[in-house]
Structure formats: C-alpha cells, structure tokens
Design a protein with these regions (language model features):
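Glycine-rich, charge-decorated loop segments at or immediately adjacent to ligand/cofactor-binding or catalytic sites
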Residues: 96-110
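A structural micro-motif
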Residues: 31, 88-89
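Conserved phosphotransfer microenvironments
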Residues: 42-86, 97-101
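A general marker of short, structured functional hotspots
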Residues: 76, 98, 114-115, 120
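Non-catalytic signal-transmission and effector/linker regions of two-component phosphorelay proteins
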Residues: 1-31, 36-57, 81-83, 110, ...
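Hydrophobic/aromatic residues positioned on beta-strands within the core alpha/beta folds
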Residues: 91-95
Length: 139
C-alpha cells in the first residue's frame, strides 16, 4: 500500500487481551493495526466526549471486541456507527447470547459469534481494500 494510512484497522480488544493473533494476521495482509483497549476505568472515551479519537479517524475498518454488557462500550459502538463513513466495515465479536441480546445495536454491523479465524480476517481485509479502491476511484 502506497499510503501508510491506507487500510488502517482499528482493533478494539478488552483490557488485558493482546489481540495478537488478529493484529499479526491483519498486518501480514498489509494492514497497519491500531490497538485500543477502551477507556481506562474512571475515564471517558474521547469519542464520547466530543474530543474525537485519532485512532478512529484513521481507521479504514474496525474490529470491535469490547464487552457490550458495559453501557459505555455500547455507546462507543453506537458512536462508531454514527461517525464512520458508510464504506468502513465494522465487525463485532460477541457471544451468541450477546448477539441475540443486543440484536438492535448490532443490526447494521457484521457479527462474529466466535473468535475471528484467519479466513474471517482475510475476508474483512478484502472488504477494507475494496472500500479503499472505491474511495480512491471516487476522488
């Protein structure tokens, strides 16, 4: 990729999780990865308090693995859906139970009810690349 910001993926993983498999797979496919563990306890995500988030603003795709049982994580996902360009693929990793419980919130994103496999991440990377190509052609 010519532009180092091209194809950047934002990987949201729970605090304590390293997301190394996802990061390594996406980087092997040519996508720089920015990791976010969500806001530290007692703080507000900059996306929710209108400061904006540089990790989000550079993202050409988002893999969201934060805990939807936490209201501020739900708010972050809603904010992604509100602010992301229509062509930015968003994938959410949840349990089958949470997929049902939060079906309304997850309606406009693709849901993985298992840990992403290399094939899942490859398909996601292809969507990011396709969106980048279309965006480049439109400019």
């Amino acid at each position: 990729m010519d532009d180092p910001r091209e194809g950047v993926v934002l990987l949201d993983v729970p605090p304590g999780a390293d997301g190394e498999f996802d990061r390594a797979a996406l980087e092997r496919m040519g996508h720089p990865v920015h990791m976010c563990h969500g806001p530290p306890l007692g703080t507000v995500c900059p996306l929710l308090d209108e400061r904006g988030c540089p990790l989000f603003s550079q993202a050409h795709g988002i893999v969201f693995q934060l805990d939807l049982r936490r209201s501020h994580h739900q708010a972050i996902l809603r904010r992604y859906q509100e602010l992301a360009r229509r062509d930015v693929p968003i994938r959410v990793v949840v349990s089958p139970t949470d997929a049902e419980r939060y079906a309304d919130l997850l309606r406009d994103v693709e849901v993985w009810t298992h840990e992403p496999t290399a094939a899942d991440l490859d398909g996601f990377a292809a969507r990011v690349e396709a969106a980048d190509r279309v965006r480049d052609e439109d400019q």
